[in-house]
A protein has these predicted regions:
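N-terminal hydrophobic or amphipathic helices and topogenic motifs
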Residues: 1-105, 109-122, 135-174, 178
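Ligand/cofactor pocket segment of small-molecule handling proteins
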Residues: 181-241
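Periplasmic-binding protein-like
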Residues: 108-113, 123-124, 251-287, 291-292
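A ligand-binding cleft/hinge motif common to bilobed small-molecule-binding domains
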Residues: 91-101, 205, 230-231, 235-255
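Short coil/turn segments
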Residues: 93, 118-119, 130-135, 188-196
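A short secondary-structure junction signal
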Residues: 138-141, 196-201, 228-230, 249-250, ...
Length: 292
């Protein structure tokens, strides 16, 4: 069986070399375990093997188009995720909850501990707005005084280094209702956990909803949501903590926005394989991708 693999969820033009290195590490681990991992990852529809008649489930129902019928230089996530030759790929819990779980197997979770707002397999999303010279949360922290609590000390430290509100230690949601009410909300996709479903669920948990926003604007990508807020075509967005870290490193317009709150911690992007992957290979994938 010839496998394909992809790592598209955290790849920007500036990070392609990093993604290639990440795949090289995976590939070597897999090959040492006897898995015939592909040399390179898929980045375009044209690089996926064709599936004449479309990708079908066990009942014969078409669940995704033949990659050969798609625009060759684009990458269609729903087709990639359902491709019968898929060895490994990232996806999002949103699509999984909305039906993708019937067609794939989850084999691992990445570690988010290296990012503000992450802890092991859990991540959270910073709530992002345009920079304000005197964010209300900072004034509240100053009034409480330094040393009043660990959180206060962290907030004051954040004030010294910039304008971002730090992620709560307990991982609970920190939703600044007064700041976001009536604002225009940008999001990457309706099935995105970090960009849409997480803020929706955290608002519902406190008796609110996305109706708190005056408008919802679908951007297609976390980076585009950040840019929309920076440029003023939207007022607020949420992106997962690793994407925000990437924006701080690579997106110049990230300097025009700030973190004003956080969604609660929840499971980050899962790693999946096809239902057609042999069971012994699935077991080895799970073993390799499990935390030490």
């Amino acid at each position: 069986m010839s496998f394909i693999a992809a790592l598209p969820m955290y790849e920007w033009p500036e990070t392609q070399a990093d993604t290639d290195m990440e795949w090289q590490r995976f590939r070597e681990f897999f090959r040492r375990a006897g898995i015939d991992a592909p040399e390179t990852i898929v980045r375009r529809n044209a690089e996926m093997p064709p599936v004449p008649g479309g990708i079908r489930d066990a009942s014969g129902k078409v669940i995704a188009p033949d990659p050969a019928t798609l625009p060759p230089d684009e990458l269609h996530g729903p087709t990639l995720w359902r491709h019968p030759d898929l060895l490994l790929c990232q996806t999002c819990w949103g699509p999984l909850e909305l039906g993708l779980d019937e067609h794939v197997k989850v084999v691992g979770q990445p570690n988010y501990s290296g990012f503000e707002g992450g802890e092991g397999p859990l991540y959270s999303s910073p709530i992002i707005m345009r920079v304000s010279p005197n964010p209300p949360w900072m004034e509240a922290a100053l009034k409480r005084g330094a040393g009043a609590s660990t959180a206060s000390a962290r907030e004051l430290a954040a004030k010294r280094r910039g304008v971002d509100k730090p992620a709560p230690d307990d991982g609970l949601p920190d939703i600044p209702l007064a700041l976001i009410r009536g604002k225009r909300f940008a999001f990457n996709a309706f099935d995105s956990m970090s960009g849409f479903l997480a803020p929706s669920r955290d608002l519902e948990a406190i008796g609110e909803s996305l109706d708190i926003f005056s408008e919802r604007i679908e951007t297609g990508a976390h980076r585009d949501s950040i840019i929309a807020v920076a440029e003023g075509s939207a007022d607020v967005c949420t992106v997962d903590c690793r994407s925000w870290h990437m924006a701080e490193l690579h997106e110049p317009k990230a300097e025009l926005v700030q973190v004003v709150g956080w969604t609660g911690r929840r499971k980050g992007l899962p790693m999946i394989t096809s239902l057609h992957t042999p069971e012994d290979v699935v077991e080895r994938l799970i073993e390799i991708l499990s935390p030490p």
